[in-house]
Amino acid sequence: MITNIGAKSLLCIVGFSITICFSSIGQYHDYGKITFERKTNLLKRFQDSRMSKMINEDNKIKIDKFELLFNDTSSVFRPIQDISEGRMGWMTTKNHYYQYLGEESQFIILGLFGQNIYIKDSLPQRQWKITESKRNISGYDCRKAIYEKNDSTRIYAWYTPELTPPIGPEGYCGLPGTILGLATEDGGIVYFAKSIQLVAPKNEDLTPDKGKNKVFTLVELKAKIEKDYGNTPWGKRMFDDLFRWL
């Protein structure tokens, strides 16, 4: 059985989950810190001949770590710095996502050529298909959901209603619980929660440092990148990388 869920249905489902919480044994939580491990298959990500000289079976899987800090209204998904990754560091993206559920808004910091790009926009509205498939991730029972981004791209997510905020890695949200697993259909990029701590985040962790930088909307940024780099041979690759999850 597969169930379709949109933004309008989500509040009812989350509300129902929270109601159950008060009659349960206290297993539902709306705050915490989740450490994620991301595995990227570099052979699937880079298929041109130049990159094949740098990537082989021994180093094709690149591992990055992230953390998701959250309470009942706000969250931040951010990379955990690894000073040992050396020259392979540029091969994968490491972005920051701040989400504010009450305001239905998000602030994103994208990394591009060693510089940061700042984006403020509304929370994405995705149509999820919830399936009957289940698995346990880091001690939490999860259910599988599918998002069809376009005709050629499907994203799989595993969420748990035991953590009630509808958030997840890379700004993915909109399910009746927190996403603990996220993957592209071909397995080229996979996120899984490795540890979950029930600790409340600090307010300063949930507030981005905007400085005096220019802030774009997603529509404005896409238009600028297409205009500036759309005619270059590497422009499409950069565009796909930046907006893979958006």
Residue ranges with predicted function:
Residues M1-I34, R244-L246:
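Bacterial Sec-dependent N-terminal signal peptides
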